[in-house]
Amino acid sequence: MSNIFRGLGVALITPFKSDMSIDFEALERLVNYQLDNGADFLCILATTGETPCLTRSEKDEITRVVKSVVKGRVPLLKYCGGNNTRAVIEEMKSSDWEGIDGILSICPYYNKPSQEGLYQHFKAIAEASPLPLVLYNVPGRTGVNMKAATTCRIAKDFPNIVGIKEASGSLEQVDEIIKNKPEGFEVISGDDALTC
């Protein structure tokens, strides 16, 4: 499977007005700014986008607005994740994925699953996903680190898992993934300190 999530990917924030409603005009400006300044793909509704604080209707409207501005000019990666495997699958099944090129899905948080638990979570999601998946390992937010061996096992077993946004902060872990990943599996930096 060809991977389109390469180069400069920008995780969009969700701009709010002072009354805490979403500022859709600011969102449109933000998307155009990123496109005008060379973003190769955009990621919507991830942790930077304040997804846990948004309602389903707000998420749907953000998706609609971003798609209407992008108009296919760059690939869109949309977040769909959580610590409840069945709920993630249900959200995948009930969401409109038209105009979206891939799904970003975080390691389950709070419950601190084992490495086998992480594997089983992503196995179920991969089997249900309508689009290519990018895993998201951010232990500083989830409380659990998906080890390199687990990442590579998942990547090898499920060809629709095309990459990982790796934010463990461990250069050693990133190096191990790069050395052992299947061909075409992308490692996207989710850690600014390791990117520089």
Give a label for each model feature.
Residues 127-128, 141-196:
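Catalytic alpha/beta core domains of metabolic enzymes, predominantly
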Residues 2-145, 153:
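Active-site beta->alpha loop and helix N-cap motifs at the rims of alpha/beta catalytic domains
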